[in-house]
Curated annotation (Swiss-Prot):
Protein name per the record: Alanine racemase
Pathway(s): Amino-acid biosynthesis; D-alanine biosynthesis; D-alanine from L-alanine: step 1/1
Reported function: Catalyzes the interconversion of L-alanine and D-alanine. May also act on other amino acids.
List of residues binding substrate: 134, 310
GO MF, one annotated term: pyridoxal phosphate binding
Catalyses which reaction(s): L-alanine = D-alanine
Keyword Transmembrane belongs to the record: no
Annotated NCBIfam families: alr
Alphabetized UniProt keyword annotations: Isomerase, Pyridoxal phosphate
CDD domains listed in its UniProt record: PLPDE_III_AR (cd00430)
Cellular component terms per the entry's GO annotation: cytosol
EC number: 5.1.1.1
Amino acid sequence: MVTGWHRPTWIEIDREAIRANIKNEQHRLPENVALWAVVKANAYGHGIIETAKTAKEAGAKGFCVAILDEALALREAGFRNDFILVLGATRQEDANLAAKNNISLTVFREDWLHNLTLEAPLRIHLKVDSGMGRLGIRSTEEAKQIEARIALDHQLILEGIYTHFATADQLETSYFEQQLDKFTTILTSFESRPTFVHTANSAASLLQPQMDFDAVRFGISMYGLTPSLEIKNSLPFELKPALALYTEMVHVKELAPGDSVSYGATYTATEKEWVATLPIGYADGLIRHYSGYHVLVDGELAPIIGRVCMDQTIIKLPREFQTGSKVTIIGTDHGNTITADDAADYLGTINYEVTCLLSDRIPRKYIN
């Protein structure tokens, strides 16, 4: 992917916001509980390497990623000795690569442990499916089989056991408690407790501090975003959003009544109006569903008109502006703010998706 340093569209990441969110979370954790920064999916769109550096500076004790490639990227970037856990499935043939790079892997099937050829010890975290329904063992019998299998191979180390809550970001807790009971039952079936027992993502840690166990997987809230709007007013501290998205007007013109813009001619001016073309489109993560949404221009709302194109978007201006004028898509301008939550609400999705969609074509600038 070619990063577009030569067009006026960019993301700003506020390192101080990330540091503040981590520090506020750490102040709530017992000293013996580790905070692991979840930097999967290019750090939820914030940039994996620079975010990891910032998180480590703030006191994060390790990292969680989704795939082995992300873990290797961290190792190659200089995180040589840091704890890294791959949360997703890894192919059996890649186990040795992980072992040689001291990367911990998630395991959720006993047969995956068969016929491994390892040149170094492999650290394993056993995933328990307590009700999420994706990956994980579901019974004490499976747990005992895996524990027995690991005991037969001196190269296998059962480093951790964990689960993931499906409803931690909801105020109603009955399903959460059901998952916890199932996880606890499987956990107590082990003859030897692993070093790391971890269940808490951002939502669980913020709302259910008793779930912290030995480590917390701090993800969405590290970036200053609420796990869900439902719990936003119940959070123990104010989150500081780290990401802002900006662009500039590359063309400004006046439409006459009857003039149309963009594909399908879905927008037609009914009177004289000023419009601007922005150098950002759905290839950058500003998907077509943003049509009809709004941005900030000089602190005023300006609607997106017509269809969002692959590389360009058109907005209706409140008045004439100069080419090169700044446009805020996510962020604050003259005291008014558009958040990732606002965009998610318009799109009918969640803030995670809004930032994860932002492609590598957009350069990230790190401030503070």
